[in-house]
Amino acid sequence: MFLKAVVLTVALVAITGTQAEVTSDQVANVMWDYFTQLSNNAKEAVEQLQKTDVTQQLNTLFQDKLGNINTYADDLQNKLVPFAVQLSGHLTKETERVREEIQKELEDLRANMMPHANKVSQMFGDNVQKLQEHLRPYATDLQAQINAQTQDMKRQLTPYIQRMQTTIQDNVENLQSSMVPFANELKEKFNQNMEGLKGQLTPRANELKATIDQNLEDLRSRLAPLAEGVQEKLNHQMEGLAFQMKKNAEELQTKVSTNIDQLQKNLAPLVEDVQSKLKGNTEGLQKSLEDLNKQLDQQVEVFRRAVEPLGDKFNMALVQQMEKFRQQLGSDSGDVESHLSFLEKNLREKVSSFMSTLQKKGSPDQPLALPLPEQVQEQVQEQVQPKPLES
């Protein structure tokens, strides 16, 4: 199955560590993305994927990602392959069972909530309003910081570019030695500003998650008296909602970080090019400075437009998730895919636990001791054993 190739490639890149650092969340992302892709594909497409020559694809992907596969990667593959295959198979088998149990939970909750529909709707309305009040300042602050940080970066870098251009025009003697300090300071200021962007703009995911937890706990405590006899089911559904909402906080942090990395990736070569042109003719250096000056404005604007709306989009996504949950408690029209968040939550917990176990047992400098086949099977069985939903 093609899923196996992709999952194992990313996981191997993760734990070898010397070529790239990938977290258990990223490994779980790959597994979940391909699980949903297979679930959504037509039957013929799934069958075609299952017939794919995994061995050849796996070897190709390993070469692309890791170069020469080392002994540690080989050892890791032998442990991770059975787990990934078993877990993906378990996930597929569990889908229908979890779907039925989640639908039953919602039906029981609806039976309790429907007589109090107006009160429940008011509780959700009040809760959403409080959530927006807590999150709106973050979106406003994010936009303000973007403008301040990017303007400050341009204000610090532009004078160095202009000084170097002026030095070229004045035909200063010993041009190269005169320009080196400016070029070095330009690079240093650029690096400092990029680190400043990362420190100031990367969302405080843990703080956002704490806000979500507090908001949902307030809602749960208000709904609890209306869920007499089914409070455990209410708690379970609230856990699923919390997982979805906190996942948005993590995605927000990833999007901001990705955009900062992209800005650095676009501008860093231009800064390096200025330094490399110091040993050449003045025409090449002048063009390099012009390119940097032009791209600095353009790339900062692209970055600003990409990141500024993220705070508001995050807030809107949380409100939509709250509204969807309210609808699920009021009718049976919104719970078609509500089981998926529970499947994903379960998958991420199991991948995190398994990866943590592997990392404790080995390192790139000390290869993992390969288990016997029956030990692998036992470990996989323990990891993928489903947790029964509380009734």
Curated annotation (Swiss-Prot):
Main location per the UniProt record: secreted
Tissue: Secreted in plasma.
Region Disordered, residue ranges: 354-391
GO CC annotations on file: cell surface; chylomicron; extracellular space; extracellular vesicle; high-density lipoprotein particle; low-density lipoprotein particle; synapse; very-low-density lipoprotein particle
Record keywords, A-Z: Chylomicron, HDL, Lipid transport, Phosphoprotein, Repeat, Secreted, Signal, Transport
Low complexity composition bias: residue spans: 371-391
Presence of the UniProt keyword Transport in the record: yes
InterPro entries, per the entry: ApoA_E, Apolipoprotein_A1/A4/E
Signal peptide annotation: 1-20
Subcellular location: Secreted
Function in brief: May have a role in chylomicrons and VLDL secretion and catabolism. Required for efficient activation of lipoprotein lipase by ApoC-II; potent activator of LCAT. Apoa-IV is a major component of HDL and chylomicrons.
Oligomer status and interactors: Homodimer.
Protein name listed in UniProt: Apolipoprotein A-IV
Organism: Rattus norvegicus (Rat)
Gene field: Apoa4
